[in-house]
Amino acid sequence: MERIIGGKYKLGRKIGGGSFGEIFLATHIDTFEIVAVKIENSKTKHPQLLYEAKLYRTLEGGSGIPRIRWFGVDGTENALVMDLLGPSLEDLFVYCGRKFSPKTVLMLADQMLTRIEYVHSKGYLHRDIKPDNFLMGLGRKANQVYLIDFGLAKRYRDANTNRHIPYRENKNLTGTARYASCNTHLGIEQGRRDDLESLGYVLLYFLRGSLPWQGLKAVDKKQKYDKICEKKISTPIEVLCKSHPVEFASYFHYCHTLTFDQRPDYGFLKRLFRDLFSREGYEFDYIYDWTIIKYQQSQKTRSQSQAVPGSSNARAIPMDTSNHRGGTKISHEAQVSDRVRPANASGPSPQINTAVGRSLGFDQVHKNMNMPSSTSLSPAGTSKRNVRPETSNSGFGSGNKTGGWTSPFMSPGK
């Protein structure tokens, strides 16, 4: 028997789940648009969909913020219907051989900084900045970076007085240890500076391929956190950023000069990276590393299929759903997350010169290359809490361990 959510979304197959609830694909019964639906039992001990829905409503309209289509009670369950998005940056990082080029990192950094600035402008901290929580769009928005998973978000200004929350110490670690700021490790209340420091670690992770505090052995989570904290604090910025442009070290130095309640100069940080981008002679054409890989594969497949009709060995982005579990947010303050899960461009579509000398528009490249359309939409709070940090993967893609991911639908691109 077909199940209709909110009177207009026909529930499809399950694409993720865990202790927090389950994620399904769904299709609008009139427009046939495909969306993502997060469902949780309304009697769960720690319900969070209502909180997430309210927060998304607050952020609604911002570039790179998923839209809520419907929220309400369906029988005995709460349901949140949202945009379906593409693969996470962690998925794409793995797909590209666990390293991004400086050009790709800088193009991503510009959008990621803008997303964080927007969330801060609405009075909230994200508090779980990591590659898994940035997803690419689909279709015509395949170039746009989205920020998701606000399950640990917190107001840093009082809604009535607009005063900044007070400085506190002895706080539990909230977020993901690998990317947490030094002050977060030390138990200091998080502020805007901490989201930005976490972003810095994400960017270095992309450039380096790993961070010095990954893979540390420990007997329990506390010891693991302590070791990560010790290694992170004892690693000089210049060592962390060695062999990479000085702008990345400057980024960290700036973050460390910010006081607890100081408003960051987001424009300064974006100019820092934009000036580097220009100096290196890059073109902001939204052609990322994964775009090139998929294009090269499509060319190879095309030549092979011409030699052997019907043959194809193109691989899609591998998506491991065996680890796509979720976790219940115990509370904003008590939650300790120790896991790490592996654009709308304006102006004319950039061109890629093909081997035969003709040009292929960016949108056409995505179409011809079967650019992976992951079902990684994570309505807020779907990231995996309390999963071992070196093993979990990102998002809610559809796939298996042995085969590449294949899109079961056409990218909505609405």
UniProtKB/Swiss-Prot annotation:
The induction field says: Induced by blue light.
Q: Which Pfam families match?
A: Pkinase
The record's top EC class is: transferase
The answer to whether UniProt assigns keyword Lipid metabolism to this entry is no
- Report the EC code(s) recorded for this entry: 2.7.11.1
Keyword terms: ATP-binding, Cytoplasm, Kinase, Nucleotide-binding, Nucleus, Phosphoprotein, Serine/threonine-protein kinase, Transferase
Xref: InterPro entries: CK1_Ser-Thr_kinase (IPR050235), Kinase-like_dom_sf (IPR011009), Prot_kinase_dom (IPR000719), Protein_kinase_ATP_BS (IPR017441), Ser/Thr_kinase_AS (IPR008271)
One GO-annotated biological process of the protein = photomorphogenesis
Write out the catalysed reaction.
L-seryl-[protein] + ATP = O-phospho-L-seryl-[protein] + ADP + H(+); L-threonyl-[protein] + ATP = O-phospho-L-threonyl-[protein] + ADP + H(+)
The molecular function terms of the Gene Ontology recorded here are: ATP binding; protein serine kinase activity; protein serine/threonine kinase activity
| PROSITE patterns assigned | PROTEIN_KINASE_ATP, PROTEIN_KINASE_DOM, PROTEIN_KINASE_ST
Question: Where is the Protein kinase domain positioned along the sequence?
Answer: 9-277
Query: Can you tell me which family this protein belongs to?
Result: Belongs to the protein kinase superfamily. CK1 Ser/Thr protein kinase family. Casein kinase I subfamily.
The protein's matches in PANTHER family, at most eight in alphabetical order, are given as: CASEIN KINASE-RELATED
Summarize the protein's role.
Answer: Protein kinase involved in blue light responses (e.g. hypocotyl elongation and flowering) by phosphorylating CRY2 to reduce its stability.
Name the UniProt record assigns to this protein = Casein kinase 1-like protein 4
Q: Which gene encodes it?
A: CKL4
